Regions:
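Gram-positive cell-envelope targeting signals
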Residues: 1-55
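Collagenous Gly-X-Y triple-helix signature in extracellular proteins
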Residues: 40, 45-332
């Protein structure tokens, strides 16, 4: 019987096709297992499917080891949370809030552009309203001390914080003191203040400003206040012209709620202020608050803003043309 021609070539062809098929199946399996197949099918190609470092989850670190870019991303996630409790859970995951729900001792040094080193700490989580109305800023910080500056060039509190020269200084020179990566990450927020100054009637005068760097108000640090009741009492004194000072206490208590860091540490009205010097690091003496002193006695005090003493004691005032410490707040 004669030999069949071509049978060897057919076998080799079949073997080659089998090898190609197996290799193709292996390639498809590898693409699917690495996520590259879906990218190819969607038209993005293999390069578009490779995860970039920015898309990977952030590692939990000691607070001072986070970069400002990382803290900005953590703050963004806190801000994007559907509610405050979810935001606190994000903060807890990254070590900013403890298991007890209180703000941890999140403090770090900040190298300023003039060579000095400031102390910075977290004082609030989802506490401030973003100025664009999109929700809450993720984190609020306190930084001290940026400078020794007067509140105004002249001795006046007319126009309050909103019209002060120190506010303008913080927006320009103050921001320039900060590291560039920090300054670029700061989110402008809305701050409530008596932006009139001295008030004689019509106490519903608190208004909003948009700020990147700002001074703390009396109520943001010390909570609900009774400073006028403490100084002047609540009952008429015989043979004197009696002034009801209760509206003034309500006014200075309405410039924003107290930040959690201060309430967590027992700061309240005229109590618990001893923790402030340790919280702020090195501060040269007293420091400004943005709250104007709203009462004028024969014109003597229409130039004053509240200040915090080096001991942490509040409720004292200083003429606005005098230099004082600049302890500022900002948000990410």
């Amino acid at each position: 019987m004669g030999k069949k021609k071509g049978s060897g070539a057919g076998a080799y062809l079949l073997l080659a096709l089998s090898v190609v098929f197996v290799a193709a199946c292996g390639a498809v399996f590898w693409l699917a297992s690495t996520g590259r197949l879906s990218s190819l099918l969607s038209g993005h190609g293999v390069e578009g499917s490779v995860e970039s470092p920015a898309s990977e989850d952030l590692a939990v670190k000691t607070f001072s080891d986070y970069s400002w870019d990382e803290l900005s991303e953590i703050a963004r996630r806190i801000s994007a949370a559907p509610d405050d409790q979810s935001g606190l859970e994000v903060a807890r995951r990254f070590g900013i809030v403890g298991d007890d729900g209180e703000i941890s001792d999140c403090v770090r040094a900040v190298q300023l552009s003039d060579g000095r080193v400031a102390t910075c700490r977290v004082v609030g989580v989802r506490a401030d309203d973003l100025a664009d109305g999109s929700g809450k800023a993720g984190l609020t910080f306190m930084i001290s001390s940026l400078a020794q500056r007067p509140m105004n060039d002249a001795a006046t509190n007319v126009g309050g914080w909103g019209s002060s020269s120190l506010r303008s200084w913080l927006e320009a020179e103050g921001m320039a003191l900060l590291p560039s990566d920090l300054a670029a990450s700061i989110k402008p927020v809305s701050k409530l203040t008596n932006n009139s100054g001295v008030v004689t009637d019509g106490f519903d005068i608190v208004s909003s400003t948009t700020d990147n760097l700002w001074l703390f108000s009396a109520s943001e640090v010390f909570g609900g206040l009774s400073w006028f009741a403490h100084e002047f009492g609540t009952k008429p004194i015989p043979n004197t012209v009696y002034t009801d000072f209760a509206p003034y206490d309500r006014l200075i208590s309405s410039e924003g709620p107290q930040y959690a860091y201060f309430s967590d540490h027992g700061v309240a009205d005229l109590c618990g202020y001893e923790v402030l010097p340790g919280a702020l690091g090195q501060v040269d003496g007293n420091w400004w608050m943005r709250t104007p002193y709203p009462v004028s006695f024969v014109g003597i005090d229409e130039s004053c803003f509240y200040q915090v003493m080096a001991s942490g004691y509040p409720s004292t005032v200083l003429s606005s043309d005098q230099e004082n410490g600049v302890v500022a707040g900002f948000c990410l």
